[in-house]
């Protein structure tokens, strides 16, 4: 049966054998090129950030036109991201994301619109990049989950070391405190290890809380002293850096995690290549690492 992007409110059941081509891995690609690259490399689906979707709509793309491109290629639109500071107000004050609005209602509505139009499975959210976690963070996350549930959307909180949700323990506290069935975690290998986490901290996470795994690699020591600059420019393909990905994936497999793997490699080096080249390299590298960890990905390159 061909893949369809016309399943509003539908949350597909996926596993670690299903690969998603994250927005940032081919961040400079046009929508058509992104979809074509994902299809050629055998990805189950793609990610599209909330601001990117909003720009496409502003440029005149209709949901029907976007859906046609996806359906013709046999690719699902599975994830979205870009909800910053779910319990904060104002804007990011400094760094590469300066000026981005926290708890941006336009981004939230874009996520819900994508869920309604394409059956997007999950949206990733982060804490704020200044200050401390707000006292009402649990309540705010619960509210976001409730609004997302009306659109069949899962909400995956991603800990980022330089944010108000810096590690797995903090993220688990928010998610379990909120207690919403569509709320859970996005676990990124880069953020886990760059934030001082290890396999022991990963083993403490209940498997059913993990909604999506982001896989990437890189050097153990930072290339740039600014965390966000480093994370947005110097990642490497899985298996080509120094992070212990086999141990990372081994814990997830042993603890019974069933979540798709989103390949998110933010890299200036990859930016110099074509989207098709990047998608092929990312798929091959990820499948190799998964196989070595005893996880057999679905879908060979077409």
Where are the predicted features?
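Active-site acidic/histidine proton-transfer and metal-coordination neighborhood
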Residues: 3-11, 32-33, 72, 88-184, ...
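Boundary/entry segment of secreted carbohydrate-active catalytic domains
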Residues: 7, 12-29
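Acidic (Asp/Glu)-rich catalytic clusters
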Residues: 35-40, 58-80, 106-119, 139-150, ...
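Conserved, mostly hydrophobic/aromatic
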Residues: 38, 46, 70, 115, ...
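Acidic/histidine-rich catalytic cores of soluble enzymes
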Residues: 46, 143-242, 293-299
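Surface-exposed, active-site-proximal loop segments in enzymatic domains
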Residues: 55-61, 83-106, 129-135, 226-236, ...
């Amino acid at each position: 049966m061909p893949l369809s992007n016309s399943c509003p409110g539908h949350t597909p059941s996926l596993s670690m054998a299903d690969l998603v081509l994250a927005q940032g891995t081919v961040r400079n690609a046009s929508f058509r090129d992104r979809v074509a690259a994902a299809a050629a490399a055998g990805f189950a689906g793609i990610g599209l950030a909330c601001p990117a979707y909003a720009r496409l709509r502003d440029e005149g793309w209709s949901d029907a036109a976007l859906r046609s491109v996806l359906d013709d290629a046999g690719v699902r639109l599975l994830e979205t991201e870009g909800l910053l500071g779910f319990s904060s107000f104002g804007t990011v004050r400094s760094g590469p994301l300066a000026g981005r609005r926290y708890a941006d209602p336009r981004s939230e509505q874009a996520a819900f619109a994508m869920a309604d139009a394409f059956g997007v499975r999950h949206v990733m959210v982060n804490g704020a990049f200044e200050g401390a976690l707000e006292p009402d963070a649990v309540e705010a996350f619960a509210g976001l989950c409730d609004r997302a549930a009306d659109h069949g959307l899962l909400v995956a909180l991603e800990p980022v070391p330089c944010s108000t949700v810096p590690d797995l323990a903090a993220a688990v506290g928010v998610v379990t405190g909120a207690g919403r069935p569509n709320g859970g975690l996005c676990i990124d290998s880069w953020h886990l290890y760059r934030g001082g986490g290890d396999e022991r901290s990963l083993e403490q996470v209940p498997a059913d809380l993990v909604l999506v795994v982001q896989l990437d690699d890189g050097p153990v020591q930072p290339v740039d002293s600014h965390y966000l600059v480093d994370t947005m420019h110097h990642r490497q393909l899985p298996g080509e850096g120094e992070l212990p990905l086999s141990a990372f994936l081994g814990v997830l497999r042993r603890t019974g995690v069933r979540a798709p793997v989103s390949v998110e490699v933010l890299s200036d080096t990859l930016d110099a290549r074509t989207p098709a080249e990047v998608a092929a390299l990312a798929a091959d590298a990820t499948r190799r690492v998964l196989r070595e960890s005893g996880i057999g990905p679905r879908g060979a390159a077409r």
